[in-house]
């Protein structure tokens, strides 16, 4: 778990939680420490266990106040199909945003006092696997970029 320092009145956390159990554990651990909304940004990997997608959607939507479902190493699969699979488990307030950079920016732009934005699934990884290519991507870097775009009022 990596806390992204910022001067705003909310937390941003990057975590590697990429399995149903890990996602449930991190959300359950964070919940008692969040006075505002718990917002989760996550996706499921492509060419991997399809059965966990709906389960992870249910866990995220049950334990979070808001969820942004996004892309996470789609590999050779269509990211939109992976997100639709996740969506089968979702209810409540959730958004689909296939561009992970935009998903992180959206969650951070909407965060307010006491909130916690959890960016789950990649953790320390600094790449996305898309159609056979390994492209540089860091959740922490994207979170810092989104935070830099926020103006304290």
Which residue stretches match the model-derived regions?
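ATP-dependent carboxylate-amine ligase
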Residues: 2-153
């Amino acid at each position: 778990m990596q806390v992204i320092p910022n001067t705003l009145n909310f937390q941003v956390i990057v975590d590697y939680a990429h399995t149903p159990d890990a996602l449930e554990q991190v959300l359950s651990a964070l919940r008692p420490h969040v006075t505002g909304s718990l917002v989760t940004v996550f996706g499921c990997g492509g060419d991997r266990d399809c059965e966990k997608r709906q389960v992870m959607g249910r866990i995220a939507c049950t334990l979070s106040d808001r969820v942004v479902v996004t892309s996470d190493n789609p590999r050779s699969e269509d990211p939109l199909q992976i997100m639709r699979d996740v969506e089968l488990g979702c209810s409540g307030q959730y958004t689909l945003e296939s561009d992970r950079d935009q998903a992180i920016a959206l969650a951070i732009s909407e965060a307010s006092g006491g909130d916690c934005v959890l960016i789950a699934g990649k953790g320390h990884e600094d790449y996305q696997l898309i159609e056979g290519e390994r492209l540089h991507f860091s959740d922490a870097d994207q979170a810092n970029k989104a935070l830099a775009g926020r103006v304290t009022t």
